[in-house]
């Protein structure tokens, strides 16, 4: 890993020296490409414009170093991440086209005007295989958590924007754990609004969706749940001044479970539909502490509101007519 870090720093230094005063514009273009606001071809074109012909290789070396560092570069076709290197033997672009025009003029009149298919000049559609730049998609596109390599690459770009030279492994690990815990808090807030749960130590929520629910019309029900005694976690170690916590006796635990079952309701809660955007919207409105930053909270609330949808009366009527037509074809009758 130290070799990759040294190679990345050396490639960044060489690229900065080659860019000179255009280094800020290059970092801005790199950020836009990483956010998928510009394509790889546009980024290469801008880099080719900022660099001289002799320094184009520094751009390629830097991209190779940063992709190797993030372990994103797995198998790319030859030349996919490089700019075209023409060197000193570049041919003049106007000669071949000029020859074609002269030869076409010398053709006979009968061969000049021939019916031509307009689609023949269109670019042939080729299905793009999921490789190369597909690994750079945002997690909002893939619907999956960002990988460690993607987070490290994003942090490297952000560090370069703020004048930092490198990102440590400890910082990447901290961001990975922070993302996981943040999503767990959001899921906990959503599930706690839909299902009953128990609380340990006054704040730790557990046993979501338990079938044993308290009966609010029984006085003993509240007492039973408030006086619930459970064993400590298996990994808890006693302190120096504390005695080790003892596990509850099996007979006492069995009596306690029977008492809770007797004090619970006689009907099970109805099954709920899958979690939708309305559940997420309500959970974020009730638990504002899940997203403490007001800017991020307001932006996500706007996105959720834009995706809220429910059928209106016309759509429901059209759906009913459609179902009746399908039933008529099958020889059935819908009421």
Swiss-Prot record:
Probably involved in transcriptional regulation. Component of the STAGA transcription coactivator-HAT complex, at least composed of SUPT3H, GCN5L2, TAF5L, TAF6L, SUPT7L, TADA3L, TAD1L, TAF10, TAF12, TRRAP and TAF9. It is found in: Nucleus. Belongs to the TADA1 family. One of its GO terms (biological process) is regulation of RNA splicing. GO terms for cellular component: cytosol; focal adhesion; nucleoplasm; SAGA complex. Coiled coil: none annotated. This is Transcriptional adapter 1. One of its GO terms (molecular function) is transcription coactivator activity. Keywords: Nucleus, Transcription, Transcription regulation. InterPro entries: Hfi1/Tada1 (IPR024738).
